[in-house]
Curated annotation (Swiss-Prot):
GO molecular function: phosphate ion binding
Highest taxon in the source lineage: Eukaryota
Record carries keyword Membrane: yes
Name of this protein: Photosystem II reaction center protein H
Gene assigned in the entry: psbH
Length: 75
């Protein structure tokens, strides 16, 4: 018994929308790699700032900053 494989190809390219036209330039650089470090340093700066933000939030949650003078009671 033979098996027949039929290749189905789609002839429609999809609908062109105004949102797609706006977003297309953002995807035009896909696959290209910038030489050197690129924006790695900028990313590291924002990661460090985010880490500082998280530490501040943690310290506030633990009542170890700004809340030292307040009595906290769960009763």
């Amino acid at each position: 018994m033979a098996t027949q494989t039929i290749k189905q190809t789609s002839t429609s390219k999809g609908r062109q929308t105004s949102v797609g036209d706006i977003l297309k330039p953002l995807n035009s650089e896909y696959g290209k790699v910038a030489p050197g470090w690129g924006t790695t340093v900028l990313m590291a700066v924002f990661m460090a700032l985010f880490a500082v933000f998280l530490v501040i939030i943690l310290e506030l949650y633990n009542a170890s900053v700004l809340l030292d003078g307040l009595a906290v009671s769960w009763q």
